[in-house]
Amino acid sequence: MQIARRWFRLASPLLLTLLLTGAGGGGTALGQDLAALEEVAAETAALRELPPVAALDPVFLTREEAEVAIEALLREEWDEDGIAAAIRSAATLGLVPAEINLLQLNIDLLGESAGGYYDPETGNLVVIQDGSFGALEAYVLSHEVTHVLQAEHLGLDELIDGMDDLTDDEILARVALYEGDASLTSILYVASKPVLALQLGAQLAAGGDLETAVFDTAPPVISLGLVFPYLTGTTFVQSLYEDGGWAAVDAAYASPPTSTEQILHTDKYLAGEEPVDVALPEAAATLGAGWEEIDDNRMGEFQIAVLLADLDPGAGLNDLMGTIELPDAASAAAAGWDGDRYQLWTDGEDAEAFVWASVWESDAEAEEFFLAFRAYEEARHDAGFTSERPDDLTLELDGGVARLALAGDTVSYVRAPTADQANQILDELMSDHLEKAA
């Protein structure tokens, strides 16, 4: 679950800003050499083949001031009820602890990592002033200037405004487009300047140990979800760039990716392969009076892969290579994804019902996920499913029952307080599948 939806405001990639920690030095005082900043902005626009920014008026903050500003931005945008529901869904699947303080975790994560950010609502381009303007700061500025260019020429504001009614998977895909674009642009900017690249290497080498304490203790769905747009998004945008130059990247803003599957497999984006819309039965009648739906969303291929990977905090990131690395089995089991949808229902107190259906590209792909998810559930609950048939399983849990079923290209998973409730909802899911297959 990409449960902190406003990460788009913080535009420097986590990997880069982890490298920023302690890596300042050399150059003139940041904020005192506007000509140097304007040069970076002009060269970035030329490289990106877009008109230069209308006016460069960056805001310079110390790290302490930036941490205060970041916290204020997060608190302003925080949807307490929506986030609470998302946490409950994520906890149901074992992705986060039920008691997690997600707001504070995000404040700490971004305070630890941010090197700068662009706020599309105010137009502020913020550069964190850690001492001097050197190669690393030029890298960050190039990234942030790209966001200004996106806002002025490519409809970034409209792209972000259109996220309100999207699933988390769709949001993560869109963020991967514009953060991948900004990341690739800043990489190419440094690569175009051999002296700057050497200075950047020297700055990083002199930076000492990287501070990743918060990242290393965060649930992987949070930490890897934060870096996915920058790392995997860069690979996606690079593929577009290699296929059709910056014109192909620009065109993606008018037809943005709609799933993390398309980010992970650029060929599927280029082929126009869209996720399947998955319908769920109305569970209210089965659950009874007083129950209400509090979360309706989509996992998507990336988050399913993270789920199946079942990583310890801090795992999954190869910071030397700048890539997300999940176990092959988890990635393979998620790779046949074709669509999914889940809902979380509550009785207003502690009782919950979770309904999740996923559709796969073939019956074989569905079975691969079914077996992988079964193994994941049995491992985390330290209990085995029971069944009379290998494709229709039951797991007794404290405070409820889980049902897992495979039918053709569809996998259904239901958790409810009673066996009758779980069975009836699963029967409705299976009936819907049979109607679709008929």
Give, region by region, the residue ranges found by the protein language model.
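Bacterial N-terminal signal peptides
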Residues: 11-22
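A metal-dependent hydrolase signature that marks the N-terminal structural subdomain at the beginning
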Residues: 28-100
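Post-HExxH zinc-binding segment in Zn-dependent metallohydrolases
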Residues: 40, 151-203
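Pan-zinc metallopeptidase signature
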Residues: 42, 213-349, 357
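Acidic helix-start/capping segments at beta-turn-to-alpha-helix junctions
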Residues: 54-74, 162-169, 200-209, 213, ...
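Catalytic zinc-binding patch centered on the HExxH motif and its immediate surroundings
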Residues: 67-81, 101-125
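Short pre-active-site segment immediately N-terminal to the catalytic Zn-binding motif
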Residues: 125-142, 173
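C-terminal soluble interaction/assembly domains
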Residues: 338-438
